Amino acid sequence: MAAKKRKKKRKNSKQVKRLKIELVGLLLIFLAIFGSGAAALSDGAIPGWLENLFQFFFGIWYFIASVFLLVTGFYLLVKRKLPDFLHRRMIGFYILLAGVLMLTHIQVLESLLVTTENTSIIGMSWTLFFDYVNGTGTLVQTGGGMIGAILFTFSHYMFSITGSKIVVVFCLLIGAIFLTNLSIGEVASKLFARVKAVSNIAIEKWTQYQTERRERKQQAYMDDESRQAVNESEDNMVTEIEVSEREEPFINDFTDVAYQNNATQATENKSPAKQAQSIKSDQEGQSDHSAEDSKDEAMPMTARENHDYELPMPDLLADPSYNSQQQEKSQIQATVRKLEKTFTSFGVKAKITKVHVGPAVTKYEVYPEAGVKVSKIVNLHDDIALALAAKDIRIEAPIPGKSAVGIEVPNKEIAMVSLREVLDKTWSNKTSKLLYALGRDISGEAVVGELNKMPHLLIAGATGSGKSVCVNGIITSILMRAKPHEVKMMMIDPKKVELNVYNGIPHLLAPVVTDPKKASRALKKVVAEMERRYDLFSETGTRNIEGYNEYIRKQNLASEDQQPHLPYIVVLVDELADLMMVASNDVEDSITRLAQMARAAGIHLIIATQRPSVDVITGVIKANIPSRIAFSVSSATDSRTILDSGGAEKLLGRGDMLFMPVGSSKPTRVQGAFLSDEEVERIVDHCVEQQKATYQEEMIPEETNEVVEDVDDDLFEDAVQLISEMQSASVSMLQRRFRIGYTRAARLIDAMEDRGIVGPYEGSKPRSVLVPKPTEEQTTSS
């Protein structure tokens, strides 16, 4: 019992001690608040008296006492214990504060000690303080307060005024060392290192500035000497426009670039037999065994190499007609003057420095002066078209990689670009099997693409704009570069007229699919093939089709059992809109899966449509097909649907396109290569003669024969009789007449559709009734 009382007593004593500490903390906070500036807010005696008390001891530094009391009070409230006032950092604070107070007092009383006979520092400080309290003096006269006065008195007696200043310096240094725990040597070394680093940077910048200045002077001197020589060399490459009193723009005809190597290419293409023999030997060198040495159980969706197969030669294509735009050059001078006059009349300071004459359009490079907004030139679109009397112009602002704005004006006549002249530029490149030719850009350079790098392509444009010719050019380019065992194709043509010419070529996996319902099943089979290929990659530890084929090649070298390589698969859909109308969900799901995952499996999509609306080219399809080609469309909305930007509505048609491959920020204007139907037939006939088509059974979309089951509903016969009499079919009518629910009525309508009694669902239109209305005799007998 006594122990319990002692324990309770100790506990109470600890509680009382904590309460005392908290009360002391609150008291210190009270003194800090009312001792520093509270007199300005309150007219009471205590705030003013406390403030004067702090000023008496600390002078102009009286707020330090308030801060010290405030921090100490909060410390007591939070920690509930007394702080260590003799800590090393606290000692440093005391020494530093003493030095500051003494220094302030020296500055105040130094002049008075020299001019007056009274040398009592404490007496003078007392007098100055009460002068401030009575209103005849200022707070600055109090200096460091009575603490500063006492310290200065002792120091002045020991060391005089000069010695006191030295004491102050040492007090500040010693206090800083105690407070920061940094030695003077460390501070000096760090300061020296920082000054040295800054000086080195300054010296380096100055040296670099001097070097650049000398280089600029030297370059300016060289430019002055070589400008004449450069102008002479450029005059040999371009045609000059003789316009007086202004700078002459350079004119670059696309024929200068397109046809500069015609003689060399013609010589190389005169001996197709030799090229075919070399190609054949190269292909034979890559394979060690023929098809007879293969395993009995061949892997599905693989093809054995036919060593007798010869690729089509460029001679099967029509010879290019080297057209030029010489008739356009006589009008360029007048066009340049009209453009500059238009700019001047609207207050736009700009110069035309270069002119590129392309197959279909002429591009004028306009260099605006500093301070001219690009939008000001773009807003002159209609005025420029009016001044040039052009049916439409296109403004490219700015030209990528140049500080210029491009104005594209249609030519009076379009120079035809043939597929052969574009393929001649790339015929030496045999490694890429999926390289295809598109046409020529404004500068005359051949524009080609590699489908395996895109990896999918979306082609859209209005009817008659050149979309089908572009698709035929892509297919022909692949047929002329790849053998059937290297590239396979799946063609879907709901229009039944565009791709049927390719039926029978050995590259096809299945006959050209023309039924939209079969097309959705064909796409599902391609998805299944993609998944099967990924299973093969997983089993062999490879990541893509190139790695898998390399793995098979190494296995074939080490083993007698020869395994075939996986071919690339190109899926062509000529009209996506028809497929989306019949089976939009299945088609979109299959295309989305292929676009997301099929690249590594060697499966690539080429999707063409003549209706570029958002319900056909959905956001999901666009997001997964980054490479796009836009032909002429009717509105800027359709252009934005294809390219995410305008411009396609200003194209001229007849193969004029905007090509935006993956990774490109802006589309490139290209004049598409023309390919006639006769040329396509010659290429197809050559491929069929070399090897007959062997379709893959597992890739042919099968027919679905749905067995119509009997309807287990007593109202079916009555519903059929009602619909035949009314010659109108709807779910709501059956609900009202027979007083049944929606589900049962909809099931009856579906059963009638399966049996050919009513037509299919046509949106807001009523279903058509396919059975005739019964006669009065039939109604009476029933």
Curated annotation (Swiss-Prot):
GO terms for cellular component: plasma membrane. Signal peptide: none annotated. ATP binds at G464, S465, G466, K467, S468, V469. SMART domains: AAA, Ftsk_gamma. It is found in: Cell membrane. The keyword Cell division applies. GO terms for biological process: cell division; chromosome segregation. The chain crosses the membrane at residues 21-41, 56-76, 90-110, 143-163, 166-186. Residues 187-782 are cytoplasmic. Residues 264-300, 760-782 are annotated as: Disordered. Essential cell division protein that coordinates cell division and chromosome segregation. The N-terminus is involved in assembly of the cell-division machinery. The C-terminus functions as a DNA motor that moves dsDNA in an ATP-dependent manner towards the dif recombination site, which is located within the replication terminus region. Required for activation of the Xer recombinase, allowing activation of chromosome unlinking by recombination. Belongs to the FtsK/SpoIIIE/SftA family. Homohexamer. Forms a ring that surrounds DNA. This is DNA translocase FtsK. It comes from Oceanobacillus iheyensis (strain DSM 14371 / CIP 107618 / JCM 11309 / KCTC 3954 / HTE831). The gene is ftsK.
